[in-house]
Structure formats: structure tokens, C-alpha cells
Swiss-Prot record:
Gene3D superfamilies: 6.10.250.3130, S15/NS1, RNA-binding. Part of the 30S ribosomal subunit. Forms a bridge to the 50S subunit in the 70S ribosome, contacting the 23S rRNA. One of the primary rRNA binding proteins, it binds directly to 16S rRNA where it helps nucleate assembly of the platform of the 30S subunit by binding and bridging several RNA helices of the 16S rRNA. Residues 1-21 have a biased composition (Basic and acidic residues). Transmembrane segments: none annotated. This is Small ribosomal subunit protein uS15. One of its GO terms (cellular component) is cytosolic small ribosomal subunit. It comes from Solidesulfovibrio magneticus (strain ATCC 700980 / DSM 13731 / RS-1) (Desulfovibrio magneticus). Residues 1-24 are annotated as: Disordered. Keywords: Ribonucleoprotein, Ribosomal protein, RNA-binding, rRNA-binding. The gene is rpsO. GO terms for biological process: translation.
Amino acid sequence: MVMTAEDKAQVIGEHKKHDGDTGSPEVQVALLTSRIVYLTGHFKSHPKDFHSRTGLLKLVGQRRKLLNYLKKTDVQRYRDLIAKLGLRK
């Protein structure tokens, strides 16, 4: 895995709602976003890595599903999260 335990703990700490929060949509989207950013950089130096590209598309789809769920349940939390992560709507 690309992210070390310290990196993961830092991302969780920035987006958690309470102590021990690892499963909220905000935390999950933030973790997926960090993996997506890493893989995007990976493809700049490895353009023919199609197997990893398939994994990237799965991650993007999973993040999209979580964002859609968050948008349906609480629009304000959705807007705050995409602003914080710098994502498009």
C-alpha cells in the first residue's frame, strides 16, 4: 500500500467528526482522494500501467458513490467536503 500508517492517521485526523471516527463518508472520501492523487502522479511516469488504471477507475467510482450518498443525506457536509478537498461538483 502506498500510504503509511502515519499518512493515513493524518488524513483521518483532518476529517474525523469525533475520536475513533474512521468510517464516516468524509473520512472515506478523503482517504480515497489521497490514493487517487498518488495514482494520478504514478501514471505520469508509468503511462502504460493499465492494470493500475483499472484500480484507479474503481476508486473514482467508489468515491463518487460516497459523495452522492453524502449529497443526498446532508448537502452542507457535502459542500464543505468538496471545498476542503478541492474537488469539482
